[in-house]
């Protein structure tokens, strides 16, 4: 299935749904140069856990994930 990832640019990824969020972060790192530990992936504004698969997170075909930078402090 196709998945859109919006970081500095909009990327289209071909995925199966079995990939983990951590794997998607690693792919984004190779595309954008943002370290995985500095990324937060969001689906409809909800942060996704690294160890969860895309299917477990409710990601469907043609979903758009937003990449946000991790904020320090509070």
From Swiss-Prot:
Record InterPro entries: FUBI, Ubiquitin-like_dom, Ubiquitin-like_domsf, Ubiquitin_CS, Ubiquitin_dom
Pfam families membership: ubiquitin
CDD domains: Ubl_FUBI
Gene3D superfamilies reported in the protein's UniProt record: Phosphatidylinositol 3-kinase Catalytic Subunit, Chain A, domain 1
Further information: This protein is synthesized with ribosomal S30 as its C-terminal extension.
Family: Belongs to the ubiquitin family.
Entry protein name: Ubiquitin-like protein FUBI
Name of the gene encoding the protein in the UniProt record: FAU
